[in-house]
Amino acid sequence: MFMGEYDHQLDTKGRMIIPSKFRYDLNERFIITRGLDKCLFGYTLDEWQQIEEKMKTLPMTKKDARKFMRMFFSGAVEVELDKQGRINIPQNLRKYANLTKECTVIGVSNRIEIWDRETWNDFYERNLKKSFEDIAEDLIDFDF
């Protein structure tokens, strides 16, 4: 399970350190792809296989299902951690998520998310307008 928030930098070659707390669960190779809200999603290979199976059930007769699958899978790439715990983020994904230098990596249960730090801070501040409790209350019945 992934949790926490970590600030890192993208170097001039498009490499970024993955937080050490995430590396063990991600293993040496994992998948990154376009995520929602202009961030990147990162999945273990096992989790990716499960997502792929779920996506196969989407009706291809629905235009939005086709669009979503195209965007999601065309952006997917398998990355490998180097000896320093870094991954190389391809240019097309850096552009999609507006990653320049300052980045934030967060854990969200079954995935990691890679954000441009300013975009993450804006998202976080914007969503604090609705309190954490209000958001929880609006969700389907869920007990901690």
UniProtKB/Swiss-Prot annotation:
A GO BP annotation: negative regulation of DNA-templated transcription initiation
Cell division is among the record's keywords: no
Presence of the UniProt keyword Repeat in the record: yes
Gene label: mraZ
Taxonomic placement: Bacteria, Bacillati, Bacillota, Bacilli, Bacillales
Domain of life: Bacteria
Keywords in alphabetical order: Cytoplasm, DNA-binding, Repeat, Transcription, Transcription regulation
Name of the protein in its database record: Transcriptional regulator MraZ
Residue ranges constituting the SpoVT-AbrB domain according to the UniProt record: 5-47, 76-119
Localization, UniProt: Cytoplasm, Nucleoid
Database matches in PROSITE patterns: SPOVT_ABRB
A Pfam family it matches: MraZ
Family note: Belongs to the MraZ family.
